[in-house]
Amino acid sequence: MSKTTTKDLRNLSDSEMSDKIQNLRKELFDLRFKQATRQLAKTHRFKEARTELAQLLTVSNERSRSNTSS
């Protein structure tokens, strides 16, 4: 998976962003489950998913704050 930049994330529509957030949360849940059952091979995916989720939530919060202040 290529690294997603915040510039790319800012170009997403609100619906695309919410879909990505939902998918990443599901992926993190699945990763935690696989790790608990010792089936996880790519442990680095935890950090990547958490980072991308944080970036998406940051951009989402920026949008909501700019909409309320305007």
UniProtKB/Swiss-Prot annotation:
Pfam families: Ribosomal_L29. One of its GO terms (biological process) is translation. CDD domains: Ribosomal_L29_HIP. Keywords: Ribonucleoprotein, Ribosomal protein. Belongs to the universal ribosomal protein uL29 family. GO terms for molecular function: structural constituent of ribosome. One of its GO terms (cellular component) is cytosolic large ribosomal subunit. This is Large ribosomal subunit protein uL29. SUPFAM superfamilies: Ribosomal protein L29 (L29p). HAMAP family: Ribosomal_uL29. It comes from the Bacteria.
